Swiss-Prot record:
This is Kinesin-like protein KIF7. One of its GO terms (cellular component) is intracellular membrane-bounded organelle. GO terms for biological process: microtubule-based movement; negative regulation of smoothened signaling pathway; positive regulation of smoothened signaling pathway. The lineage of its organism: Eukaryota, Metazoa, Chordata, Craniata, Vertebrata. Disulfide bonds: none annotated. The gene is KIF7. Changing R154Q: In ACLS; uncertain significance; atypical phenotype. Changing R1068W: In BBS; the patient is a compound heterozygote for two frameshift mutations in BBS9; hypomorphic variant in vitro. Residues 358-479 are annotated as: Interaction with DLG5. The modification Phosphoserine is found at S898. Polyubiquitinated by UBR3. Essential for hedgehog signaling regulation: acts both as a negative and positive regulator of sonic hedgehog (Shh) and Indian hedgehog (Ihh) pathways, acting downstream of SMO, through both SUFU-dependent and -independent mechanisms. Involved in the regulation of microtubular dynamics. Required for proper organization of the ciliary tip and control of ciliary localization of SUFU-GLI2 complexes. Required for localization of GLI3 to cilia in response to Shh. It is found in: Cell projection, Cilium; Cytoplasm, Cytoskeleton, Cilium basal body. Residues 356-382, 451-483, 611-639, 1219-1238, 1310-1343 are annotated as: Disordered.
Length: 1343
């Protein structure tokens, strides 16, 4: 919509094509017995509403039409026109809950099965497939996603965009233009589906009474295709400088709503008002365009924003298809009629469709940059839906075949090029075996032979190593051009013929494989349908046919929801047991097929149900064994989602719960089949087909899930590898920059040291100047100049420190890049491991699927045998049903023919009361028996608990006994030891009396040690005696436990005694009541035998009506329970879809993060390059500064030489004056000695003249100033006076030696006033003349 198309004069009239799609009845509608009010005739394109309202449309799709049929009938022609340059629009119209969003495919974006994919995913997959097949096309595809909510625009791809920033305008050609909407360039189906899911997450949805996930806004998904370059023959060829631009709009309108039905309040009510007003405006536009009498009148496009967006689609420049979705339920009769009326009017709308061209110059520069980037990745990585293509027409068959062959040739040549390069590398390997090397050499020779044969055929379709453009021009020159062209044509025709032959072989093999696969799939589907039908009949046999089995009979595909509007940072959803929508047998929006209502006896299906459930449990067990090999959390979630374990449990529980019956006995439960009105509340014609999840379907779903996961991981791995490459390049750039920065850091450190030295010297001089008393204004000005320069030096030091810190931060980038590179490599390795696991799992699933198919073929024989048995049982059941019907007719005739008197009625009522009392006695007897059984169970539990406590107590008592025995043993041991010590003490005492003094000392020590040991043993014996007297043989915790056990056992004994008394009492009462019941039963039979036939029939009718009432109440409860289970199933499905959306968002977040990191690395590379360039510029600037400084020094040197020359001339003049004063040398010398000051002044004056400008020049470094001040005068200055006379004059030498100390004394005085840093001196132009080396040499050596 943001593109401007130029309309050509030759416009094609294209009427709006209308397709009608009828959705199946919803499970809730089937549950409440809603009737279908539509009769569909798809072959005639006609539908009848009610009895006498007939409508005809271009396409009519019945309830059993799949998504593929909708796409082929409605969208496939539009896609072809889209590639031919026409604008196309497809929009869904209908009431809320009629299946519009499901048809468009926005609700099933995350679905893994092909049958659930809607229009948008299929169209985008087909578009990218066509682009991939046509390599000669240069295409650019970009998409946008817009929402109209409460008459305000919202960009679903850029949620932060304000509504006021999106404006709808018209250009000078009348085209509708949307400004401010984000358009994203896409290269594959995965990107489109990711954008759709992202937009659906931001779309407004909500719950109403009619639809739990109702669209609360209109959405427009726009795909723009730009084609340039050479186009295939079946497509228009763009003119030079022209661009073929076409737009495809997928519009999902919100459904019309009735407030009373939807129960909308508050915000939902406001949304409903806005939706109905915009749909009313759209209906007015359709009515105005579709009414032949109103042609040329005003069309109210501006009444709503959605009508302004659809201006080109309705009556404008586009080919449009309208899909009207209706509900067949009789409760939606009025809404269905309204939709059919509008759809019928829309067939009269005529559009003027043209091919849209745009000048190439109008292409925005950003698109040019994006189009000039590298070749895009192949779209085969995306989730392209594999399906059969429609057979092309005879007019385009040859062109399409030629196009396909050209694409095949290009692909074969590319593969040959790659194989040639790889085999050349392989041939260079030393370890290649001889046979393999020979085969490789033969293949390379064959390829080179073909290359030499086709060496003249260069261009985009040539063979390996085709000639360049210059070679083509050289080969095509002269008279050989026609011969070579003919030879090339012949060679290419032969090659095309060979490739066609190979292609035909491949296609034949592919068709055989596809045919075999279709046969196997059809056979498997038939087997599954037969099993499902048998399950249906078995479920309908049982009396309690509602409730869970009814819910299982409703195809869960009807609950497929759209992704719900949810906060982006919501909590994690709870994992509930549910069936994933991908493995459900539902076809489309609430696709449930109606089964026949069969009346069977319970004994007729018990054996069949047992066998079928046994088979189902076997497959479930096999699936469970395979899943047990995985991790426990994943296995648990998988089993919950597929409900394999639940099916197995039900299969094992049902056969045991069925009582065995030997004969076809008639019971009250079987009378339900003949009771009118006992099946449903709203009607007796509700038909439900019970369907179970076949193991093969679950296996296919797991296969598709694993394949999708592998594809997504492959894309993430590729993106991570690209990011790793960017990180490697960034690391190399950072290393190069680190080397430069290291050098720069060293230079900055040297410069900083120099600046610090200058700063310290300047501060020192400044302190010296401040310490002295300033005499004049010049010194004060110099002091201020020093202070200013010190401050400048300090700021320069600070700047250098900051530069050093910034440089160090840049140096640390390399280490960070290395760390991130290692982390990304670990992530890629982990992803590869996951990919390997998924591939192994994929192989296992494939093997399991093969085993299941083999097992299904074996089960088929058993199913046929069961069918024969079932037919026999059906005959028996039919006989019983006829008997029941005859009995009812007889009962009705008897009740109508007899007149019951009032006394008989009272008697019947008394008998009924008496029977009710007897029934109550029986019920009381049963309740008493149940209570007795409960008491017995409780007593058993108490006895078991007492047994456990007794065992624990026995253990503690045995432990106490063992402790007591151990203590007794300790006492015996201690006593024996004491006796032994007593004997030793008596012996030692005798030795002590008889021994010597030395031995007595030793014996006393031994006696002391023995007495100490005796005392300790006595204490130990006392402690043991105390324990035995106190009975503390166990630890305090064990003693407390033993005490508690005694108390608990005592309490249990009391409880057991009480239970025994209660049981005895109940048994006594039951024995008495049993005798009474036996007597009552005899009396009951006697009284019933005395009743007349009319009284018996009347009494039976009373009880029959009571049973019917009870059955009605039970059925109402079952319906309520089924509704609750359906709500639970919907919530579980919502949780599943949210989990899928969350997983997709995680992958998308990972991809976006990878892209951002890649962009960041590219920005870092640019920053490093700029930093490197800036650093080079800085080095160049410093080099230029040094060169300028050298030039300034050379200029100063020239100036000093000029001053030197002037001083020589003055000195020569002074010497000449001295010679002319007299001829006596002694007097001249004495005068020179007497008046040295004048001569010094004459000698020093010019020197002071050239020293004074130094104080006024630009600042210099302290070292330069010190060198200039303290450097000795050049030797040429000392020799300059000898140019005109003898050099050995001692008088003149003494004069010069006398003058030199004066110069030494004068210079230090000026040193204090000299600045510590000099700059270039300002001199006249004539002084800037640089002296040549020859002149300098002449001046130094004048002789």
């Amino acid at each position: 919509m943001g593109l401007e198309a130029q309309r050509l004069p030759g416009a094609e009239e294209a009427p709006v094509r209308v397709a009608l799609r009828v959705r199946p009845l919803l499970p809730k509608e089937l549950l409440h017995g809603h009737q279908s009010c539509l009769q569909v005739e798809p072959g005639l394109g006609r539908v009848t509403l009610g009895r006498d309202r007939h409508f005809g449309f271009h396409v009519v799709l019945a309830e059993d039409a799949g998504q593929e049929a909708v796409y082929q009938a409605c969208v496939q022609p539009l896609l072809e026109a889209f590639f031919e340059g026409f604008n196309a629009t497809v929009f869904a119209y209908g009431q809320t809950g009629s299946g519009k969003t499901y048809t468009m495919g926005e609700a099933s974006v995350a679905s893994l099965l092909e049958d659930e994919q809607g229009i948008v995913p299929r169209a985008m997959a087909e578009a990218f497939k066509l682009i991939d097949e046509n390599d000669l096309l240069d295409c650019l595809v970009h998409v946008s996603y817009l929402e109209v909510y409460k008459e305000e625009f919202r960009d679903l791809l850029e949620v932060g965009t304000a509504s006021r920033d999106i404006q709808l305008r018209e250009d000078e050609r009348g085209n509708v233009v949307l400004c401010g909407v984000k358009e994203v360039d896409v290269e594959g189906l995965d990107e489109v589906l990711s954008l759709l899911e992202m937009g659906n997450a931001a779309r407004h949805t909500g719950a109403t009474h009619l639809n739990h996930l109702s669209s609360r806004s209109h959405t427009v998904f726009t795909v723009t295709l730009e084609q340039r370059g050479r186009a295939p023959s079946r497509l228009p060829r763009p003119a030079p400088g022209q661009l073929l631009v076409s737009k495809f709009h997928f519009v999902d309108l919100a459904g019309s709503e009735r407030v009373l039905k939807t129960g909308s309040t508050g915000e939902r009510l406001k949304e409903s008002i806005q939706i109905n007003s915009s749909l009313l405006a759209l209906g007015n536009v359709i009515s105005a365009l579709g009414d032949p009498q109103r042609r040329g009148s005003h069309i109210p496009y501006r009444d709503s924003k959605i009508t302004r967006i659809l201006k080109d689609s309705l009556g404008g420049n586009a080919k449009t298809v309208m899909i009207a979705c209706v509900s067949p339920s009789s409760s939606d009769f009025d809404e269905t009629l309204n939709t059919l009326n509008y759809a019928s009017r829309a067939q009269n709308i005529r559009n003027r469709a043209t091919v849209n061209w745009r000048p190439e110059a109008e292409r925005p520069p950003e698109e040019t940059a994006s189009g000039a980037r590298g070749p895009p990745r192949h779209r085969s990585e995306t989730r392209i839906i594999h399906r059969g293509r429609r057979a092309p027409g005879p007019a385009t068959a040859s062109a399409a075949a030629a196009m396909r062959l050209g694409a095949e040739c290009a692909r074969y040549r590319a593969c040959t090029d790659a194989a040639y390069s790889l085999l050349r590398e392989l041939q260079a390997e030393p370890g290649l075996p001889g046979a393999a090397a020979r085969k490789v050499r033969d293949w390379l020779c064959a390829v080179e032979g073909e290359r030499s044969a086709l060496s003249s055929a260069s261009g985009p379709d040539s063979g390996i190593e085709s000639a360049s453009v210059e070679d083509q021009a050289a080969q095509g020159a002269g008279g050989r051009k026609e011969d070579e062209g003919a030879q090339q044509l012949l060679t290419l025709q032969n090659q095309v013929a060979r490739l066609e032959e190979e292609n035909r072989d491949f296609l034949a093999a592919l068709e055989d494989a596809m045919e075999q696969y279709k046969l196997q799939s059809d056979r498997l589907r038939e087997q599954q349908e037969e099993m499902v039908e048998l399950r249906l009949r078995l479920e309908l046999v049982r009396p309690g046919w509602g409730g869970p089995r009814l819910l299982n009979g409703l195809p869960p595909g009807s609950f497929v929801p759209r992704p719900h509007t949810a906060p982006l940072g919501g909590a994690h959803a709870h994992v509930l047991g549910m069936v994933p929508p991908a493995c459900l047998p539902g076809d489309e929006v609430g696709s449930e097929q109606r089964g026949e209502q069969v009346t069977n006896g319970r004994e007729a299906g018990a054996e069949l149900l047992t066998e079928v459930n046994r088979l189902g449990s076997g497959s479930s067990a096999a699936s469970e064994e395979e899943e047990e090999e995985e991790e426990p959390p994943r296995r648990t979630l998988h089993l919950r989602r597929n409900r394999i374990s639940n099916c197995s449990q039900r299969a094992g529980a049902r056969p045991g719960s069925l009582p065995e019956r030997k004969g076809p006995e008639l019971c009250l439960e079987e009378l339900d089949a003949a009771i009118p009105g006992s099946r449903a509340v709203g009607g007796s014609k509700a038909r439900v087909q019970a369907r179970q999840v076949p193991p093969a379907t679950a296996s296919e779903w797991r296969l598709a899930q694993a394949q999708q996961k592998i594809r997504e991981l492959a894309i993430n791995i590729r993106m991570k590898e690209e990011l790793i490459g960017e990180l490697v390049r960034t690391g190399k750039a950072a290393q190069a920059l680190n080397r430069q920065h290291s050098q720069r850091i060293r230079e900055l450190e040297q410069e900083a040291e120099q600046v610090r030295a200058e700063l310290s010297e300047g501060q020192r001089q400044l302190r010296e100047l401040e310490g002295k008393e300033l005499q004049d204004a010049g010194e004060r000005s110099r002091l201020q100049e020093f202070r200013r320069r010190v401050a400048a030096a300090q700021s320069q030091v600070q700047v250098l420190k900051e530069k050093k810190q910034a440089t160090e931060r840049l140096v640390s980038l390399s280490a960070q890049s290395e760390k991130r590179l290692q982390e990304l490599e670990r992530n890629v390795q982990l992803m590869r491991q996951q990919q390997g696991q998924l591939q192994r799992r994929l192989r296992e699933e494939t093997e399991q699927k093969r085993r299941l198919e083999a097992e299904m073929s074996k089960r088929q024989h058993r199913v046929k045998e069961l069918e024969l048995k079932h037919e026999q049982q059906q005959k028996i059941l039919k006989i019983k049903t006829e008997e029941i019907a005859a009995f009812q007719r007889k009962r009705r005739s008897g009740s109508n023919g007899s007149v019951v008197s009032l006394e008989q009625q009272q008697k019947i009522e008394e008998q009924k009361k008496w029977l009710d009392q007897e029934m109550e006695k029986v019920l009381q007897q049963r309740r008493a028996l149940e209570e007795l059984g409960e008491e017995l169970h409780k007593r058993e539990a108490i006895l078991a608990k007492k047994e456990a406590l007794m065992q624990e107590k026995t253990g503690l008592e045995s432990k106490r006994l063992r402790s007591s025995q151990a203590l007794n043993e300790d006492i015996v041991r201690v006593s024996s030891r004491l006796e032994h010590l007593e004997k030793e003490l008596s012996e030692k005492s005798g030795q002590l009396r008889q021994g010597s003094a030395q031995s007595q000392q030793q014996i006393r020590g031994e006696i002391d040690s023995l007495r100490q040991e005796k005392d300790s043993l006595l204490k130990q014996r006392l402690e043991i005696d105390g324990k035995l007297r106190q009975g503390s043989l166990l630890s305090p915790e064990e003693e407390r436990t033993l005490f508690q056990l005694d108390e608990a056992i005592e309490a249990l004994d009391a409880a057991i005694e009480y239970k025994n008394e209660a049981i005895t009492c109940r048994q006594r009462v039951l024995r008495a009541s049993a005798s009474l019941l036996s007597q009552c039963e005899m009396n009951l039979m006697a009284k019933l035998s005395y009743l007349s036939s009319s009284e018996t029939r009347a009494l039976l009718c009373k009880y029959f009506d009571k049973v019917v009432t009870l059955r009605e109440e039970q059925h109402q409860q079952q319906i309520a329970f089924s509704e609750l289970e359906m709500q639970l199933e919907e919530q579980q499905r919502l949780v599943y879809w949210l989990e899928v959306a969350l997983e997709r968002q995680r992958l998308e977040m990972d991809r976006q993060l990878t892209l951002q990191q890649k962009e960041h690395e590219q920005n870092m590379q640019l920053l490093l390059q700029q930093s490197r360039d800036h650093l080079g510029e800085g080095l160049a600037d410093s080099r230029r500064q040094y060169e300028a400084r050298i030039q300034a020094l050379e200029k100063e040197l020239g100036r000093y030489m000029w001053i030197n020359q002037e001083l020589k001339q003055k000195l020569g003049g002074v010497n000449a004056v001295g010679h002319s004063r007299g001829g006596e040398k002694r007097s001249l010398c004495s005068e020179g000695r007497q008046a040295p000051g004048n001569e010094d002044e004459l000698h020093l004056a010019p020197e002071l003249l050239w020293l004074s400008p130094l104080t006024e020049g630009a600042p210099r470094t302290r070292e330069e100033t010190r060198d200039l001040v303290h450097a000795p005068l050049p030797l040429t200055w000392k020799r300059s006076s000898l140019c005109g006379e003898e050099q050995g004059s001692p008088e003149e030498l003494r004069q010069r030696e006398a003058a030199e100390p004066l110069v030494g004394r004068v210079l230090p005085v000026g040193e204090a006033g000299l600045p510590w840093n000099f700059g270039p001196l300002s001199k006249p132009r004539r002084e800037l003349r640089r002296a040549s080396p020859g002149m300098i040499d002449v001046r130094k050596n004048p002789l």
